[in-house]
């Protein structure tokens, strides 16, 4: 049982970051100005901490779950005609079964009609528990590889390249800056991908999601809640569409021991516009107060037998809250 949970956590974190990392994106100046204004006032900067739990279903009849196996940190900042979003997420080897260490990071920096994206994830394309176990054994033998994406975007096109980086140790998400520093020193870059952008393409998965949530929350505050319009973005040479498939108003929402009022629970789909493949996830957020439009919960199920959940835990003392500054 523990083996299944351990492998499942590894695959879950990798799958979530594969979707989230798909956020290297450009856009037009008008759309970027709207994003920079966003849902929060220019000059503001926010950081929120989440605790991760995971569930694996070895049989069709029941789930096996583990709580507090990792963390996530979401940041957002705004200035006139500028916006910055980041997501750091991963399992914590000090808490996860078998010291599972799977994590990733993405940062989107939008300035006027230009944007840059940096994404990082542990190199582990596991499709099964068995593959996860095999990768764990290789890592114990000294193989610690990461994939790092750098993208630059303007109003017309996106250029991105993935670099393979070998780390001297089994770095966790606490060492995100150390891994990024290795890229320029010892990385092996792949072929640069260049793609022309249709008008209205947004500058990243995170910024596209923030815009979608903002429009949805505005309709909820006006008591006319609706899912909203699809938003397109680009990732490493491919175009994607983000859309909310449904949204429900919640007078109250309980998350662990916390209770929130006036929240929205929404479901989303990300579609690869080239092949039609879809990735689905759900999240909830408050529509008023200091946590307005901040995700309270996030749930993602990449396989029928696995699910990862994040819950807001700003009140939990965590050393990981300072990880982005290291």
Q: Where would I find each of the regions flagged by the language model?
A:
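Bacterial N-terminal signal peptides
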Residues: 8-18
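Acidic, serine/threonine-rich low-complexity disordered tracts
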Residues: 25-163, 212-326
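Mixed-charge (acidic/basic) macromolecular-recognition segments
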Residues: 134-199
